[in-house]
Design a protein with these regions (language model features):
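Cytosolic regulatory regions built on CNB/CRP/Popeye-like sensor folds
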Residues: 1-214
Length: 214
């Protein structure tokens, strides 16, 4: 697996890889200087078939985005149960960093894909929601809105697949923010929503894993 600091890549490579990724494109449009901060704390990964991108049990603060290829998620110890597939455009790795937990699954580059290209950003640079000394409010809001949307989408998928499950409607009980936008108050609310949604998604995963074992 090849890993390269993103800020060391050529501008052409950065533009070709991130130009079509809405999150990074919006980050650049918000503030090119803050975008450079992201680049300095991000890495580009090229994983060949069968190579491990994330290993269950490891502890880190990386937030991942799949740009090209396909990844397969395996659960269990050892990682033998295929539980999900990650396709281009998806965010992953957010639950562990939100809940401050070890990685719960192993993610491997699909053996049917020639190469999988991933960008990962060190989420520790975001600090606590009220800490605006490094990453500024607009960029934090962009990332947290994206994570909340991603988590709600994953939970909606589970709801559609298992409509009679006891967890099916729980994510809809997590209150949306109704106050002034583009404020620290909104950011704090998004952080709270993200943690609750991540916790619920973990509960879903555990429940479905138990069901598979029975």
């Amino acid at each position: 697996m090849d890993v390269c600091p993103l800020h060391q890549c050529s501008q052409q490579t950065i533009d070709s890889l991130l130009g079509s990724v809405a999150l990074y494109k919006q980050a650049y449009q918000l503030d090119p200087i803050q975008f450079d901060v992201l680049l300095r704390h991000s890495q580009l990964i090229e994983a060949r078939p069968g190579e491990v991108v994330i290993e269950a049990g490891q502890i880190d603060t990386w937030l991942y985005f799949l740009l090209r290829g396909q990844l397969v998620v395996y659960a269990g110890d050892p990682a033998v149960r295929r539980v999900n597939v990650i396709t281009p455009g998806e965010i992953f790795g957010d639950m562990a960093i939100l809940m401050d937990l070890p990685r719960s699954a192993t993610v491997i580059a699909d053996v049917k894909t020639r190469v999988s290209v991933v960008v990962r950003t060190d989420f520790s640079i975001f600090g606590e929601p009220q800490d605006l000394g490094g990453v500024k409010l607009p960029l934090k809001l962009l990332f947290y809105r994206t994570m909340v949307h991603n988590l709600r989408w994953k939970l909606e998928v589970y709801r559609a697949q298992f409509p009679s499950h006891s967890f099916a409607a729980d994510h809809r009980k997590i209150r949306l923010y109704a106050g002034p936008r583009d404020t620290v108050e909104e950011l704090v609310s998004l952080d709270n929503q993200a943690r609750q949604l991540a916790g619920l998604l973990i509960s879903w995963n555990l429940a479905l894993t138990r069901d598979d074992d029975e």
